């Protein structure tokens, strides 16, 4: 790495430490993201066709909404399978992202905290408000990871204000973990009296933009008032050489197990 690049990385790190987040514009290859979006949609559309719903709709969005209402179990299964697409995982461990975590965010020994999360947010595809508009919370509460843990987020389309973009509160990571207990959906919500709504910043990112933020940063999602689905991906990383993480004994709070038949219905 040349001196100029090293200085640039250090300046970005200083900004990241102060603000708690950094947005890198046009960081990811558009073609890779568009291909990933097609793969995700193919999973749902395959079941739209299999359930003989394709003849009743003109657009993909109509098809997935019909699948949601006609066969929710299959819809939910599709939602689970898109979390495990190979290209979703490949992006999370790509050299470009890992190098950024190490060279800019200064993770010494990055490790994956939990599986990737592919989010699809729309009021027409939700059984609970939490599935389309997530209140302000801190990921650090549920991660229980390293003190310098990082969350990476990026959209799979241009995300305008109407789509309900990622919303963050700059510098809120400096408050430490102030979220209360984790709820049934796995979120550590922050009481509204602990932050100022006037400080909220909406990140209207374009396709290819990516956001790196401190896991303690207070954030949530805007309200998607459009007729479109907001697609995005999120990844979480710990630092196995972080002293606090070492002293805590490397807790890993995520439970992976096969589901019982009654749970799958």
Where are these regions (language model features)?
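Non-heme Fe(II)-dependent double-stranded beta-helix
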Residues: 1-18, 25-136, 142-143, 255-260
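Active-site rim elements
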Residues: 85-90, 195-201, 220-222
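Non-heme Fe(II)/2-oxoglutarate
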Residues: 2, 46, 50-54, 62-69, ...
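Residues that flank catalytic or metal-binding motifs in active/ligand-binding sites
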Residues: 84, 114-115, 148, 162-164, ...
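Short, solvent-exposed loop/turn segments at secondary-structure junctions
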Residues: 28-30, 118-119, 141, 159-161, ...
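A structural signal for short, well-ordered beta-strand segments
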Residues: 116, 152-154, 233-237
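A structural signal for well-ordered alpha-helical segments within the folded catalytic domains
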Residues: 95-99, 150, 206
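Catalytic core of non-heme Fe(II) oxygenases with the double-stranded beta-helix
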Residues: 102, 129-203, 242-253
């Amino acid at each position: 790495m040349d001196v100029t690049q090293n200085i640039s990385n250090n300046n970005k790190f200083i900004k990241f430490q102060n603000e708690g987040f950094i947005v890198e514009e046009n960081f990811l290859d558009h073609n890779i993201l568009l291909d990933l979006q097609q793969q995700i949609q193919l999973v749902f559309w395959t079941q739209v066709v299999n359930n003989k719903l394709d003849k009743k709709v003109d657009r993909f969005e109509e098809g997935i909404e019909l699948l949601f209402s006609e066969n929710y179990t299959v819809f939910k299964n599709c939602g689970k399978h898109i979390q495990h697409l190979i290209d979703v995982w490949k992006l999370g461990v790509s050299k470009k992202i890992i190098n950024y975590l190490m060279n800019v965010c200064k993770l010494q020994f990055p490790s994956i905290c939990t599986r990737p999360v592919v989010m699809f947010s729309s009021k027409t595809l939700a059984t609970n408000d939490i599935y389309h508009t997530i209140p302000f919370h801190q990921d650090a509460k549920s991660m229980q990871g390293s003190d310098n843990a990082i969350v990476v987020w990026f959209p799979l389309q241009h995300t305008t204000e109407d789509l309900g973009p990622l919303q963050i509160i700059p510098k809120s990571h400096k408050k430490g973990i102030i979220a209360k207990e984790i709820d049934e959906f796995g979120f550590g919500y922050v009481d509204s009296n602990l932050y100022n709504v006037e400080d909220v910043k909406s990140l209207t990112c374009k396709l290819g933009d990516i956001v790196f933020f401190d896991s303690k940063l207070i954030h949530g999602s805007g309200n998607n008032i459009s007729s479109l689905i907001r697609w995005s991906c999120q990844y979480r990383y710990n630092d196995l050489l972080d002293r606090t993480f070492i002293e805590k004994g490397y807790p890993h709070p995520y439970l992976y197990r096969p589901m019982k038949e009654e749970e799958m219905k």
